[in-house]
Structures are given as structure tokens and as C-alpha cells.
Amino acid sequence: FKNKFRYYLNSILSKINFSYNLSMLFQLLILTILILTLLTALIYPPNTPDSLSYHMSKVMHWIQNGNVEFYSTAITRQLYLSPFSEFVILHLQLLTNGDYLANLVQWFSMIGCMITVSLINKEFGGNNKSQLFSALFCATIPMGILQSTSTQTDYVVSLWIIILAYFIVRYKTTKSIKYIYAFAVALGLALITKQTAYIYALPFCVWFLFLTLKRPDHFLLLFTIPIIISLINFGQFKRNFELYGNPIGIHS
């Protein structure tokens, strides 16, 4: 009986395309997470203490004042912290006359992270199934699921840092100069999104520096990186310097 059972079981299993079914399972799980988080982001308005006291309050002050200059407030982090995510929310707020789409900034950033992680996997030789698994791993990070339905900035800055890492990998593979400029833009956007990028981007900057040391002609182009970063962050650097005397604000 055991031999017959084993025979029939092996016959059934041999007819199942596990590779195909596993890929379908990964896609189904990713789609389920995206749909559930999208519905949550659309149905529920921004309601975390951080959203109400910082992110959305900053946006409403800008709308009320008609500009993004600093204003009088007891919550000074509304001023000196990097404002990129809130700039995007500001546009959505004005276009829809409400906060209906405010949570989608982080939700789309989650999708961007999933795509970029899968592309990095591909650069290291991953096949379609491993790329899907990478995207699924990214989508199932518990804090990521919570962040994807809020107006916080962690997923947005994560997106820029992951893109930055992808450009480093592409530069290592192709040695193309365009990835030096792409790296600079991604780094500048990360810094204008959240100031923790100064810490988390540092190891990638060191890695990129070592890669360019192997190409003296490319190494000289590194001097364009701080210029690009300064251009992207100029407005916030200027406002912080005028009020606090330094470009990154009160805690420097």
C-alpha cells in the first residue's frame, strides 16, 4: 500500500509545474498586499499622530500662507526637516481639494521599492522567480505595510536609497558615466526627503567612491555630485541657514 501511495503521489507531483505555480503564488500574494494597502490608504484619512502634528499640518500651513517659507510654530520640526514628501502631498491636496490621495505617496513608493529591489536581484543574475520573491519580501516587511498607508516619509526615502543602490550596481556593471549623475540625483532626492538619508546613504557613498577610484577619469566627475545635491536641496538649505545658521537645521 505504501509503495502504491508513493507511486501515485510521485505521479501527481511530477505533473505539477512547481516553478510556474510558485511564481503565480508570489504574484497573487503581492497583488493581495497591494490591493489591501491601496484600499486602506484611500478609505482612511491620515490619522497617525505624526501625520496630524507634522506632515499634514505643514502642508496646511503652506496652503494657508501661499508659500513654503518658514512660519511661526511651536513644532519646529515642521520647519527644518526635509520637505520632499510634503511637497508631493501639497500638490495632491490642491488638485483634489482634500487629503484623499495623501497616503498614496508612500503607497507608490512601496511599489517603486518592490520594482527596484527586483531589478537589483536581476543585476546579480536572478531569474523571474527570484525577482518575484525579492519583490514579495519587500512587500511583506511589517513596518513597510504600515508605512505604505500613511503620510510618513520612510518609504519615500527608502525608495531613493534603493534606487541609489541600483545605480551603483549598474555603474559597476556598465562603467557608464550617466550613472554617476543618476547617483547624484538619487542621493539629492533622498536628502531632500528625510535627513536620516545622511546616515543610511553613507555606506553606499563609500562603496561608490571605491568603484570610481578604479577609473581616474570618472573619479574627477565626483565633484559634480555635491553640486547636483546642492541644486536639489538649495531651497531648504537656504531657509534653514537663514533661520538656524546652518543648512540642515536645529539639530546640527
Stretch-by-stretch model annotation:
Residues 44, 210, 220-252:
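Membrane-lumen/periplasm interface segments of specific transmembrane helices
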Residues 44-58, 64-88, 96-100, 244-249:
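Extracytoplasmic catalytic/substrate-binding loops of multi-pass membrane glycan-assembly enzymes
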